[in-house]
């Protein structure tokens, strides 16, 4: 994923990024993410087939069906089962970020998110191994 942010210094940010992706034949290999809806809208206008993810701390219901967002990345502490279900109902995927504690990882998994974004891959691997064991044991007993 390439996260795009406006800083006020850039000129034609979306066009420049898209040109680079096209030059390196990477349009189908990348996901463009942003907290800025305008950036995602512009990317979809320029290249309708590009994958996009709307990144947010939290979501309002009217944001569940953004035409220019193929998926969502929501701060894990703010995810709810209802939010994930509503986004899935719209045919879109949901990722939780930034899960750097097992508590946040558990919340993201329990909400039914499609993926986890973390800075601590080892902790996530350990967490997932432990969760798989618990689920396996629970199904036996």
Regions from the language model: what does each represent?
Residues 1-141:
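Short loop-to-alpha-helix "cap/lid" segments that border enzyme active sites
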């Amino acid at each position: 994923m390439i996260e795009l942010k406006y800083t006020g210094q850039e000129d034609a940010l979306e066009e420049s990024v898209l040109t680079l992706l096209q030059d390196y034949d990477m349009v189908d290999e990348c996901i463009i993410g942003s907290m800025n809806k305008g950036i995602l809208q512009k990317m979809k206008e320029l290249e309708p087939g590009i994958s996009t993810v709307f990144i947010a701390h939290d979501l309002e219901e009217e944001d569940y069906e953004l035409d220019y967002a193929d998926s969502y990345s929501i701060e894990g502490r703010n995810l709810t089962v209802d939010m994930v279900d509503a986004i899935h109902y719209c045919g879109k995927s949901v990722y939780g970020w930034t899960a750097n504690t097992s508590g946040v990882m558990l919340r993201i998994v329990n909400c039914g998110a499609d993926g986890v974004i973390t800075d601590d891959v080892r902790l996530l691997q350990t967490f997932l191994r432990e969760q798989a064991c618990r689920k396996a044991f629970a199904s036996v007993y």
